[in-house]
């Protein structure tokens, strides 16, 4: 290529655009613009190309050497539109040529130019810098569009096959930027090489698309740009590009024949399929991501999530919902992972929609009949098969069977484990699963598809529910350490697993799962003295035994129990917490538990206010309190933790569940106790137990009833404690209780207040781990409010 020399002066006045017919004198030009094969023929030196000039401004032909400079200068002087300099690679005829008339150019249309450029691509794109300069002046994008038609002409007129052709393609694609990327191929004398290489390499991803309005494959930028939509170009030049943009743009590739069946992969498309187990439906779901949207297809009935499908098409919500509402056969899913929610429609209807919206190729291989064969293909075939087999097994067994108390071996768990291999060993579950998951590579939900652990957990939760026994384990399945996973799963699967919990919950594994919470056990330990103190009081003494029943609550503290317990309130609580009738007893009971009382009321005539208070939130609230109590008496909780955990699971008290849910978040912190309470609406119940723990003396002196009552009054503080954390907070809470007194039910009365004060008087034994300092007393007030709730 000649070195760029001083740019030739632009002679705009004398240039005349040759008529289009002249331009067409080239053999290739005569051929339909889109016929890139014809265009592929290199220009002969004899071929005359019109000077490249923008339709708006005529440009004197520039010698090859000066192309770049002239191009740059021209672009500067003539704006992008004037830029027609060709790359030095192809010598340009020095004789000034008139650029095709703008009208002619307009008539040629971009499509024409694009086609031409796709052909020999020898035509240089006047506006686009061609050859070397094409990259220099990508600025002529706007002008490029004008020039493109003309680019065709130029291409035909260029004396020799020039990389200009590639430029033309680029310009056509307005891929001058990409063009630059593409240029290297373009530079090659043979436009053919340039066309396909640059086209597919850069064009489809690059500017070509920009030139073309939308989805046109940018590859073979010129040809595909304009004409791609109009005429299918030979696959040869587009073969690569289609692969790239076939999927990217969603428009069929030029050389690619649109496959309305969805069975044929667009050129260059790589089937990317992931699978997830939809526990709720008991089916494996294949997922394909297009335009950032995960479209799922069920393996059992092959229904497809129509909502996500139409989202891929970029349809508005109103139109999408209207279309889906009119579907006769549809399955509406409102609960579950986000990518599985929506309106599921039959496979055939989904395919029709995809074809109407021209997104079938984008969704490949969603509609492939044997989509399972593409899953993790080919490297993970074994794992894929295992997943599919397990899914089928689950279907055979039925989701219910899995959920029923299958014990530690629910196939669902297997799935989860398999999916979440990370979990396998941590649950020493008896489940064959563990070994299975160990054996097979883990298909973490996260790995398999973009589903948040939460959604996975819901699935897992079900699994757990199926084998609630496995809560801890399953929580682990989520890939979190057993302990943590438990807390996670616990939250999601508490309600679900409650029913199965009694039968399936393995205390050992659960405890393991809760180990993390157990670390909170330290918190319990801090309250250990509370446990000890309760022993000092008869009331408290029972507390320790109660600890076990309470353990579910205390469990929050023990972590092991805590998690499970969160899931279900202790038996006593279960009966008491939920039922108002037992309120007094429950309250006492709860407090007893909270305070470590073994007896349900410990026979203590807990002030009626307290039961009354319990009644306010009694069932759930007391249960919550129990949780708080646990917080207060973590040591007790710890003691009873294991069996307590089981007990709470068995009891399946909703409040406990709530506690667990809340516990999970808060429990992560030192105060699982109040976390548990938090699950139920944050209530002071735990506080009261905390209170009792903190002011065991108070409880004792107040007499069992008083103590319990104190506990009740404590609940507000306890709540505060739960919020504040440490028992110290609980004390503060008591102080708050004094303030709270007004807020609290009259039933509490002075007695309650005195009890509270007693508690307040007590030295802060040490709040829940990370408990809030007295400064957090306001929290207590909040706790009181929660209690009122």
Curated annotation (Swiss-Prot):
Feature: compositional bias, Polar residues: 55-69, 76-88, 115-131, 419-438, 487-529, 620-636, 645-667, 676-713
Induction (record text): Expression is down-regulated by resveratrol.
Assigned protein family: Belongs to the EFG1/PHD1/stuA family.
GO biological process, one term: conidium formation
Biased composition annotated in UniProt, kind: Basic and acidic residues: 741-754
Upper lineage: Eukaryota, Fungi, Dikarya, Ascomycota, Pezizomycotina
Domain HTH APSES-type: 272-378
One cellular component (GO) term of this entry: nucleus
GO molecular function: DNA-binding transcription factor activity; sequence-specific DNA binding
Stretches for region Nuclear localization domain: 731-758
Main subcellular location: nucleus
Family matches, as InterPro entries: EFG1/Phd1/StuA, HTH_APSES_sf, KilA/APSES_HTH, Tscrpt_reg_HTH_APSES-type
Protein name stated in the entry: Cell pattern formation-associated protein stuA
DNA-binding region per UniProt: 306-327
Function: Transcription factor that regulates asexual reproduction. Binds the StuA-response elements (StRE) with the consensus sequence 5'-(A/T)CGCG(T/A)N(A/C)-3' at the promoters of target genes.
Residues in coiled coil: none
Gene3D superfamilies assigned to the protein according to its UniProt record, in alphabetical order: Transcription regulator HTH, APSES-type DNA-binding domain
Compartmental location: Nucleus
Organism: Aspergillus flavus (strain ATCC 200026 / FGSC A1120 / IAM 13836 / NRRL 3357 / JCM 12722 / SRRC 167)
Location of region: Disordered: 50-131, 205-224, 389-459, 487-543, 616-789
